[in-house]
Amino acid sequence: MSKLFDLQGKVALITGSTKGIGKAIAEEMAAAGAKVVISSRKPEPCHDVCEAIKAAGGEAIAVPCNVGKKDDLMNLVDETLAAFGRIDILVCNAATNPVYGPTSELTDEAWDKIMDTNAKGTFWLCNRVLPEMDKNGGGNVIIISSIAGLRGNATIGTYGVSKAAEAALARNLAVEWGPRNIRVNSIAPGLVR
């Protein structure tokens, strides 16, 4: 009987993959045979998840990265390509929400941090990875948005705006890159512990 998801020979780069949704995605993709790149800001959790995947029989590398910093993102892609030679799957999962409360009370600095990390970081990473996928004949991009991007919220409104921007980015990239055999989707999960 064949496996439903066989990712043998595929390389998956997953941001924010040391806990929660990102970690679960990395573990499942590794179990399906993908070579996975574990990434988040802090090196130690990256290493721990990477080693756990290897102990379970998977193949993984750890590349710490702050997705709000363009140089970090370029390095993440460069190290992935150096290790595995290609990127078949990109999961943009990393995000930040340092402030809770009404958008009207948000400082410019907090707005910039949320938008730079969540929306601009995803934009930068996709623009770096998509041409690499095109060189290899195609690929898949999954942008983890949020239900907060689909409805207003007085507590996490700016986070929601950033996630709505990610969903819109996914729609645009799907139109631009779909004819080149690159599928781009956005998923909008609800609250996760």
Give the location of each predicted region.
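Alpha-helical segment proximal to the catalytic Tyr-Lys
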Residues: 131, 175-179
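Residue(s) in the substrate-gating loop at a strand-loop-helix junction
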Residues: 146
